[in-house]
């Protein structure tokens, strides 16, 4: 899938925009604060239901407006479809696909698999485990049809179990929740383990190309002890969980550890090297999806030139072109991206929320 057209209304500093897009590279050039990142964020929001710079919908709605509206035309192999998202200040969303309402945001996410590379994206490597769980869960969501339902049910049951921990005095009182929770936890952990194993070679190969000076290793940790039954862990941990008033073990505590030469990457790599690693991981994940399903990602890259020298920018550009995917790149100057441009790409200039090509 690729976006052929994007309409933006009352999103951040953009009052109205109607963009005809290239199926290849689309460049957004403008000064800081011009609105170029807002275009990337609008695309991301259309596919995720939320912005990547703010979780509060009111902050991305243009000043003194009640809602934002995003609309896109998606070109697939066989046909084109329309998608739309409206969200108001209260956070209420309306999703429309091919002219019909009542759809879920998860449907948009499935239609528009995206990889996001931003200056804030270092959290994948130096942030908490939740960011690396999200990396694995993106892959599971796009590779396992039942993942989203299982993951949603797991979140619901954990919330209910944690609330119950404040009220119960004996473990037997928790069994109704654990009876449902245990098979879900084991299934999600199995999916994550299988995905991390399947993509490991792709990640290793891509990382070797981007960071040949390091030996990188990847390890999945499921959130409770190896070779231990989750049911036993929950029962054994009851008193501690009750004291903490939350469930201390499970797939919600999983991690995906990345090491360079045996040490955590956040302690070993420079900022430039961390950005290269982040790019390599996102590329590997997108390429794995294409190979396994035939579907291509949209790549969103904010502030392309930051942290990368000319050689590394050239390497990233060549790898992105090889994916034959649709790519959106923001930059302060056209000079930073002109070498990536070809006859099929489009260059947009962004100034004070106005976009021209």
Curated annotation (Swiss-Prot):
Q: What are the alphabetically sorted keywords of the record?
A: ATP-binding, Cytoplasm, DNA damage, DNA repair, DNA replication, DNA-binding, Nucleotide-binding, SOS response
One Pfam match, given by its short name, reads SMC_N
**Location of the protein in the cell:** Cytoplasm
A single GO molecular function term of this UniProt record: ATP binding
Just give the chief location class.
cytoplasm
Q: Name one GO biological process term.
A: SOS response
Tree of life domain: Bacteria
This protein's GO cellular component annotations are: cytoplasm
Q: Please tell me where ATP binds in this chain.
A: 30-37
InterPro entries, per this entry?
DNA-binding_RecF (IPR001238), DNA-binding_RecF_CS (IPR018078), P-loop_NTPase (IPR027417), RecF/RecN/SMC_N (IPR003395), RecF_2 (IPR042174)
What family does this chain come from, according to its entry?
Belongs to the RecF family.
Q: What does this protein do?
A: The RecF protein is involved in DNA metabolism; it is required for DNA replication and normal SOS inducibility. RecF binds preferentially to single-stranded, linear DNA. It also seems to bind ATP.
What the entry lists under PANTHER family is as follows: DNA REPLICATION AND REPAIR PROTEIN RECF
User: In its UniProt entry, what is this protein called?
Assistant: DNA replication and repair protein RecF
> According to the entry, what is the taxonomic lineage of the organism?
Bacteria, Pseudomonadati, Pseudomonadota, Gammaproteobacteria, Enterobacterales
Q: What gene, per UniProt, encodes this protein?
A: recF
